[in-house]
C-alpha cells in the first residue's frame, strides 16, 4: 500500500495525518513536489522533488501511481487523470474523486477559474480547520481500509 501526496498544495495538517496513519498501518508515503518541502523524518516517507515546470509533479504522480494506491491532491485535473487510470484520489478536505463526480468537479473548477480570471470571484478555498481535518481523517481511514482489502 502506498499513498502519494501532491505536496506543494497539501496542508501541513493533512500531511501530518497521513504520516500518522502510515506509521500505524505500515504503508509508504511518497511526497512529490516541484520545490523542496519539509519531509517528516520517518523511513516510511520519501520526498521526490521534480524539476520545476508546468504540471511536472502532476505528471510524475500520474506516471508512477498505480491502481490500489491513493493520491492526495486538490488539483481537479490531476484527480481526473488518476481516476481515469483507476487510481484512488482524495482531496485534503475529505472529498473523494470518482467516476460519478468527476464531471461535476471539473465543470465547477472550470467555472470558478473563469470567474476568477474575470475578477468576479476572489481568493481560493476557506481556511483548513478542525472540521476539514476530521472529514479528511474519516475519508482517509475509509479509503485505506477499502484499498487494503484489495
From Swiss-Prot:
InterPro entries: UPF0178. Disulfide bonds: none annotated. Pfam families: DUF188. PANTHER family: UPF0178 PROTEIN YAII. Belongs to the UPF0178 family. HAMAP family: UPF0178. This is UPF0178 protein PP_5221. It comes from Pseudomonas putida (strain ATCC 47054 / DSM 6125 / CFBP 8728 / NCIMB 11950 / KT2440).
